[in-house]
Amino acid sequence: LRTGFLDYAAKAYREQLRQDVWPFERFLAATVALGFLLEAGWLLLTLAFPDYIGDPLVVLLGFALILLLVAYFFMLPYLAYSEKGATIDKEMHLFITRMGVLAASEASRKEMFGILAGMREYGTLAKEIDKIFTLVSKWNVGLEKACRTVASQTPSELFSNFLLRLSHAVETGETAEEFFEKEQTVIMDQYEIRYDSAMRSVEIIKEVFVVLVVLVLMIMVLVTFMPFLVMESMGPWIAVTGGFMITLDLLIIYVLEAVVPGERIWHNMKMKTIVQKKITRKFQYSIVMCFIVTGIMIAIWPYLNYYLDLAIKQALFQPASVELQHPTYYIIPLLILSVGLTPLLWPGGYVMDQEADIKRRDGQYPAFIRSLGGSVGSRSKSFTLPLKKLRMHDFGPLKKNIDDLYKRLSVRIKTERAWEYFAAETQSELISKFNEMYVEGSKTGDTKKISKIISDNFIRINGMREQKYESGSNFLWMAYGVAITMSFLLFFGLYIVEQFMILFKDMSIPTEAVQQTGLFFFSFKESMASLPVLWTTSWVIIVIHCALSALMVKSITGGHRMSSAVHFVGMLWASTISAFVVMYAAQFLVV
């Protein structure tokens, strides 16, 4: 394993430098800029906390950051090379499907590579294919030798093995159709293994995330009790712990983006559909409503605070003249933000409904394309007559799209344009990509074979996606639990601090007695930050964490940005309710 890693690392440095794709000047400039930022941060820390800068632990931490920066600089070629390999692997299922379709349409191997080399949507994979096409067409290198040459240089092991098998098939005289028909199963099996491995990694990341969050929450609870143990203000420590929590969230998002298979639910075609225009319009209206609702909530803030306090007093059977030990105005801003952002549920809910329809269309598409391929193959190359019969069948949410496709073709709209409208209006990324392959291959090839290749691979990929949806659903409930727990622990800890402040605010203990007994909590009110600042810091941490948790769910499921807004608002409301429960329970305990 160690030898394999070292060999891959050596190959990464060699290929990056040979191809001149390691932009040394850019990386050096970025490193210098980051060094200046660290130096500026160090100076600010020196000015803000001069007593701590000379501490050996702080100095050691500074040197560790510098060493980490240097290590990152030298690791950049390896990281860039590995990222290219991962990008190629993520496109292999689409690549092999398209190759199978082109082979069924009786295109030569050279023509197939020429077509794929021009498809920039494949990114790094298209560049690797373009190398083969250039070697064959411009340098007159044999296809088998060109495949071996690129296989020795490509960062993807999956693609390298495929090229070696292709080279052997060319040498033995195996036809392109036979080879790519067998490769459908081989590549899809390997892709599925890697997909399952990635999803298992996601489960591990989720477990690590929960463990780290629990650890940070425990630290937050301990920090709230710091004034009772040492003569230190807990304000900076809560801010540092909250910053660590936010950094942890960002790191988890980065890791998920790198590990989770990169398919999206929604397509990214240039054509704007009615649904996309509705989403944009609803979002714009909801933003205006957010400002209006927030303005109203701020205007009624004093009345809101009064009536909430009154409601709690009535629930505790206390007269209105009794002063609450824990007034509600500390957490009113969190309530205002929750109410103010609630209008985002309107476009977000619409997006989630559309995503449910997209998933149902994805489930019906393989049956539709297989039926269409058989009908077209047995009649003619025209889609109109087969679609006329197929539109009578119930394909769920896909039925309307089939009807619209038939109507466009029947009025002599260009075939490619009609199918493009069909793919765009389904909103599905999978359908848009596989649909393009079907239309391209059906012009000259056997539509029955092509539809079988597409439907079989589509079913397998759609089945893999179900793992993502299930994992995202599980993580969503986990994120809600973390948000509720964080809100409860933070506000409960601050409530206890507040009660001790009230208890000891009139006490006067000599400093000598405090130092002799070690009871620093008698003087903590002089050393700690003001409570309003601590409350504000706490709910800011909660809001940022809820937003980042919603983005984590999006990273796993591949959904729309507006669907993450629904989860953000939901977690924000859950945190707000948790805060009010703490307040109510605290008043009950005091009474």
PLM regions and their residue ranges:
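Bilayer-spanning, highly hydrophobic alpha-helical transmembrane segments
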Residues: 25-46, 63-71, 193-255, 289-300, ...
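Hydrophobic alpha-helical segments characteristic of transmembrane helices
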Residues: 1-16, 96-116, 141-150, 157-197, ...
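Hydrophobic alpha-helical transmembrane segments in multi-pass membrane proteins
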Residues: 126-127, 157, 161, 212-220, ...
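Juxtamembrane/interface alpha-helical elements of multi-pass membrane proteins
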Residues: 56-151, 161, 283-287, 294-304, ...
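Small-residue-rich segments of transmembrane alpha-helices in multi-pass membrane proteins
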Residues: 275-277, 372, 572-574
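Juxtamembrane boundary at the C-terminal end of a transmembrane helix
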Residues: 581-591
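Membrane-interfacial amphipathic helices
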Residues: 1-51, 72, 76-82, 258-332, ...
